[in-house]
UniProtKB/Swiss-Prot annotation:
A Gene Ontology BP annotation from the UniProt entry: translation
Keywords annotated in UniProt: Chloroplast, Plastid, Ribonucleoprotein, Ribosomal protein, RNA-binding, rRNA-binding
Source species of the chain: Marchantia polymorpha
InterPro entries, A to Z: Ribosomal_uS11, Ribosomal_uS11_bac-type, Ribosomal_uS11_CS, Ribosomal_uS11_sf
Protein's recorded name: Small ribosomal subunit protein uS11c
Length: 130
């Protein structure tokens, strides 16, 4: 199960943030949640791997939910009330991470999907035969 939450030291000490941007990057192997201020400087981050999940458990929706809760816990202490959410990637944890953010009580001004879509670029990986 996940490790106990370790405190990520803030670069500029305890600062008040009324508004910020939450970036969710959901790949097939891991989910990374990064919280920045409006200028783009990272305030806190968390990932399924940093929460103590290993191997295939990192790619589960529950691991993404835990990562989102850990990243947001620091924000609520700093007084963040409003945030924008940018979701990127096709992974299984994208919806669960968003649901965890909604439950935290932060008002979401908008949710934007910024997944890069190719206009017929690189060839995708082959389908797995199990």
């Amino acid at each position: 199960m996940p490790k106990s939450v370790k405190k990520i030291n803030l670069r500029k000490g305890k600062r008040r943030l009324p508004k910020g941007v939450i970036h969710i990057q959901a790949s097939f192997n891991n989910t990374i949640v990064t919280v920045t201020d409006i200028r783009g400087q990272v305030v806190s981050w968390s990932s399924a791997g940093a929460c103590g999940f290993k191997g295939t458990k990192k790619s589960t929706p529950f691991a993404a939910q835990t990562a989102a809760e850990n990243a947001i816990r620091i924000l609520i202490d700093q007084g963040m009330k409003q945030a924008e959410v940018m979701i990127s990637g096709p992974g299984p944890g994208r919806d669960t991470a968003l649901r965890a953010i909604r439950r935290s009580g932060i008002i979401l001004s908008f949710v934007r999907d910024v997944t890069p879509m190719p206009h017929n670029g690189c060839r995708p990986p082959r389908k797995r035969r199990v």
